[in-house]
Structure formats: structure tokens, C-alpha cells
């Protein structure tokens, strides 16, 4: 990983360099997809040029350049619950911000958090709708209701939505939260 893109307040992308010395100490790269259900392998559709539209679900609009499939591969899948089950909670008692933008797999990933969603996540940013983009329909209202019923309150709604966990209302303002588009 060379860099991550962070959407700043002035609406420009800022490149954050990742220190290679931190890999395997503070940063672990796990080459797997996330979803719900049991661990398995699944099909992954890699789009041409990687414009951010690759997905576990086949694109509907492959006539558009950003949805042209370059390759179809099999990838391993786990849930965030599986990951959080071995997370060092004794060192990090909560996750300040969880950002999910997984091209129509977002609801699957959030459901795959299990109780960790309501117990350990302070801020949540998700892409709640990819309507007419993939051969998989995420119901935005059902997705939103699931998050709210998990103890979250809305910060902003739209295609990308932000929420905060009411369980952490006493510390939410001490966290340097930024909406990550």
C-alpha cells in the first residue's frame, strides 16, 4: 500500500503516506473480502483501471467505462466479527470510525459485525445505496433501519451516510471525526 486517500474539510484529497515500518506492527494487510455468513470463497469482479467499482457483485452497466470488468477472480471471505473476535480489545477498547464503501456489499459487511457494531464502533460511514449498479439490491431503508436499531443516530443521509453510536455519546465529541467520502 502506497497511500490512502482522506477526504478533508476543504474537499480536496490529501495523500497520507503509510510508513512501511508500521506494517505488521500497527498495520496488518489481510487479503480477504468482507461479508456476512460463514467463511468461504466468492467471485470478485475486478473493473478496468480500478476506478473504485470492483465488487463481489456483477456490475449491471458494463457498457459504461467505470463498470467494464477486466477480470473475475475468487477471493476468500470472512466477517468483521471473525476479525473482531481476535482483535486486541485490551489495547484498543473501541473503534473510533468504521468506513465501509464496498459496492453493494456494505449491508452484508455491517450485518457481519455481529454485536461489535453496537458495542465497539463509535462512528460509522457507509454507502447505503448503489441502486442500478450491481446485480444485487441493497434496500436502503432496511439498511438504515438496521443501523438505527443497532443504537446509532444519524449525522447525515444520502448515498453515503454517517452515524454515531449513542452508547458513546459521552466521548463522541473528543474524537477527531471526519466524514470519509
Where are the model-predicted features located?
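Phosphate/nucleotide-binding beta-alpha loop and adjacent structural elements of enzyme active sites
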Residues: 1-181
Amino acid at each position: 500500500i502506497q497511500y490512502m486517500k482522506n477526504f478533508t474539510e476543504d474537499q480536496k484529497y490529501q495523500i497520507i503516506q503509510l510508513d512501511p515500518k508500521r506494517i505488521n506492527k500497527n498495520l496488518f494487510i489481510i487479503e480477504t473480502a468482507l461479508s456476512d455468513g460463514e467463511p468461504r470463497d466468492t467471485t470478485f469482479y475486478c473493473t478496468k483501471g480500478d476506478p473504485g467499482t470492483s465488487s463481489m457483485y456483477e456490475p449491471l452497466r458494463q457498457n459504461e467505462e467505470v463498470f467494464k470488468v477486466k477480470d473475475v477472480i475468487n477471493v476468500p471471505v470472512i466477517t468483521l466479527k471473525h476479525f473482531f473476535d481476535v482483535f486486541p480489545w485490551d489495547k484498543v477498547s473501541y473503534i473510533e470510525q468504521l468506513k465501509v464503501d464496498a459496492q453493494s456489499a456494505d449491508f452484508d459487511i455491517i450485518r457481519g459485525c455481529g454485536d461489535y457494531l453496537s458495542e465497539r464502533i463509535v462512528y460509522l460511514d457507509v454507502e447505503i445505496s448503489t441502486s442500478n449498479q450491481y446485480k444485487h439490491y441493497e434496500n436502503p431503508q432496511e439498511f438504515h433501519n438496521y443501523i438505527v436499531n443497532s443504537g446509532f443516530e444519524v449525522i447525515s443521509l444520502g448515498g453515503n451516510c454517517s452515524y454515531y453510536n449513542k452508547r458513546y455519546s459521552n466521548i463522541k465529541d473528543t474524537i477527531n471525526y471526519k466524514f470519509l467520502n
